[in-house]
């Protein structure tokens, strides 16, 4: 088997140059890189990443830790990956995707064995043991979402303004004349859930009002059923019990689809009799929605790109300032499509041929 010395000799360069071509630790000209790669291919040379990691104590692997729902990824998660992967490729890192089951907080011991240089953590929860575990092991981390408690000042994170966004989309529904707005939210232990609840309440407070009791529900048991099934069953029962509900706000597109199915079963026309709005926009489920769904574009790809860049700053910079906790807020947009209308609207009052309109959320 060819060695790095063989490649260097055949290519007429130093061992260090060959090493840098493969590790991308230092910039090498395009011409030299292509020449070395061609020689390596001819010699059938493959770098031994694990041997190298034992020497420099670096694996050049980034961990991405997220919760999976029965092995299905959401559009948000796909978009986030599309933001992370190109940066990893350009900077010579590999990505280890950890999709733990919903009870991942009891599986932190698995994270300790991950051969990663740093970790990106998604779906932050209150008292997140994943964050504490990484801090104790001195593993650089970036959280996508808001860390809870003192972690907010101890670790870098990337987030949307979830309080402000939830307030604005709720205000949008209120401005359309809706007063009974059902909010099908995520698990109560997630920080994003708490922030969106706060924004929802804030919108009513700004109008000098309070939402009716029982208008906020949470899917706390993620193992019992999918988000779609939960929202379908919840919307079906709540809309039957309370016909005064004229709008539903959901945590995800999948939940919104459940509401659409419940509305169809109850013969409620969207948006004439029921308005639906969700956090999330334009995903793989988009073709399932008729009329087109109004939603919030969270720009998950930008969240992913910013998160990996913050993490690589910690890994590659020696300046202490680059290791300080930083916060980045990614703006979101309300994309108005065909699923929301005024409470007093008449059938067919919404022109479905109009293109979606974006409003800064």
Give short role names for the model-derived ranges.
Residues 1-58, 355-361:
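N-terminal helix-turn-helix DNA-binding module of bacterial transcription factors
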Residues 27, 34, 43-108:
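Amphipathic helical "hinge" segments at domain boundaries
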Residues 67-76, 97-106, 158-168, 184-234, ...:
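Hinge/beta->alpha junction and helix N-cap segments in small-molecule ligand-binding domains
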Residues 104-116, 230-244:
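Short, well-structured alpha-helical segments in soluble
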Residues 122-167, 254, 280-293:
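Flexible loop/hinge segments that line or gate small-molecule binding clefts
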Residues 179-180, 211-215, 270-276:
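Short acidic capping loops at alpha-helix termini that bridge into adjacent secondary structure
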Residues 232, 236-361:
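Flexible loop/turn connectors
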